[in-house]
A protein has these predicted regions:
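Positively charged n-region of N-terminal signal peptides that target proteins for export
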Residues: 1-6
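Extracytoplasmic copper-binding redox domains, predominantly the cupredoxin/blue-copper superfamily
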Residues: 18-140
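Sec-dependent N-terminal signal peptides of Gram-positive bacterial secreted proteins and lipoproteins
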Residues: 10-11
Length: 140
């Protein structure tokens, strides 16, 4: 009987901490993402919704450049589950040079931040990236 109680308690307590979360990000009318810096845990999912037309998600960098998520279609719902800790940079393909960028920080891990900062961007996008990095680091 004690074993059953222990197992029940263990399952309840461990499942309480193992649920992955889903974050919702919308494409906005002002050519930005509704959440510009998303801080998530390993195993969490981000869903991008086309609340405004003419936008998509294209990853420019992450902890492993060889296995970045594929670019989404324009005006399409898009979902990515993040299983590798680190910093991910993405933009809207048509509006990236105008600063439509987003950062995902997985597991509060900034080990690849220098690689992200080294990605070639327009002057406007580089300025936006620096602002997003300051936001991410101030909340860590």
């Amino acid at each position: 009987m004690h074993l059953i109680i222990f197992l029940f308690y263990f399952i309840i307590m461990s499942s309480r901490f193992s649920f992955a979360e889903t974050i919702q990000i919308d494409f906005t009318a002002d050519d930005s993402y509704s959440v510009e810096v998303a801080k998530i845990n390993v195993g969490d999912t981000i869903e991008w919704s086309p609340k405004n037309e003419g936008h998509n998600v294209e990853f420019l960098g992450g902890p492993d450049f060889s296995s970045l998520p594929e670019k989404s279609d324009l005006n399409a719902f898009y979902s990515v589950t993040f299983n590798l800790p680190g910093v991910y940079l993405y933009h809207c393909t048509p509006h990236g040079n105008m600063g439509m960028l987003g950062l995902v920080i997985v597991g509060n891990d900034f080990h690849n931040l220098k690689d992200i900062e080294g990605i070639e961007l327009s002057r406007v996008a580089k300025s936006v990236l620096q602002r997003l990095i300051r936001i991410a680091q101030s909340n860590s």
